[in-house]
Amino acid sequence: EYDDMYTEKRPKVYAFGL
């Protein structure tokens, strides 16, 4: 799950792989 790492630099949308 990238939610934890991506949400820090990118919006929640990117966390899912969009």
Swiss-Prot record:
Top-level division of the source organism's lineage: Eukaryota
Keyword annotations: Amidation, Neuropeptide, Secreted
Signal sequence interval, chain numbering: none
GO cellular component: extracellular region
Residues where Leucine amide is found: L18
Location in the cell: Secreted
GO terms classed as biological process: neuropeptide signaling pathway
Family: Belongs to the allatostatin family.
Function: May act as a neurotransmitter or neuromodulator.
Name of this protein: Carcinustatin-13
